[in-house]
Amino acid sequence: MEKMLLKSTTRHVRIFTAEVVDEELKFHPNKLTLDLDPDNEFIWNEDSLNKINEKFNELIKERAGKDLDDYELRKIGSEIEGLIKFLLQNGQLSYNPDCRVMNYSMGLPKTNEVL
């Protein structure tokens, strides 16, 4: 029986047991592909992207030798979501005012002014 492509989807993180070939996802049992912020809700800089990629690689290494089932993928996705929120709360990431829908899914931006 051929294995199926697994995925974990959160609001800002999508993880697939696949690799990108000719702009298409192709199942691969030993590779994960990260699709970060598919709705462009945030403005990303190199530093914040590097932190996300480092954390993603760290989480994968921690699971070396384990089956990458949907539960493990969800745990990885949840940890990446937590890092996104941390970066946002610490001013290392900001909301994109040009995104399709401005809903502040990770909380209202912090300002010095009283709302």
UniProtKB/Swiss-Prot annotation:
Protein name in the entry: NAD(P)H-quinone oxidoreductase subunit M
Membrane topology field: Peripheral membrane protein
Quaternary context: NDH-1 can be composed of about 15 different subunits; different subcomplexes with different compositions have been identified which probably have different functions.
A Pfam match: NdhM
Matching PANTHER family: NAD(P)H-QUINONE OXIDOREDUCTASE SUBUNIT M, CHLOROPLASTIC (PTHR36900:SF1)
Gene: ndhM
Domain of life: Bacteria
Family as reported in the entry's similarity comment: Belongs to the complex I NdhM subunit family.
Keywords for the protein's UniProt record, in alphabetical order: Membrane, NAD, NADP, Plastoquinone, Quinone, Thylakoid, Translocase, Transport
Lineage of source species: Bacteria, Bacillati, Cyanobacteriota, Cyanophyceae, Synechococcales
Source organism: Prochlorococcus marinus (strain AS9601)
Signal sequence segment: none
EC identifiers of the protein: 7.1.1.-
Primary location class: membrane
Function noted in UniProt: NDH-1 shuttles electrons from an unknown electron donor, via FMN and iron-sulfur (Fe-S) centers, to quinones in the respiratory and/or the photosynthetic chain. The immediate electron acceptor for the enzyme in this species is believed to be plastoquinone. Couples the redox reaction to proton translocation, and thus conserves the redox energy in a proton gradient. Cyanobacterial NDH-1 also plays a role in inorganic carbon-concentration.
Reactions this protein catalyses: a plastoquinone + NADH + (n+1) H(+)(in) = a plastoquinol + NAD(+) + n H(+)(out); a plastoquinone + NADPH + (n+1) H(+)(in) = a plastoquinol + NADP(+) + n H(+)(out)
GO molecular function: oxidoreductase activity, acting on NAD(P)H, quinone or similar compound as acceptor; quinone binding
Cellular localization per UniProt: Cellular thylakoid membrane
One GO cellular component term: plasma membrane-derived thylakoid membrane
EC top class, as a word: translocase
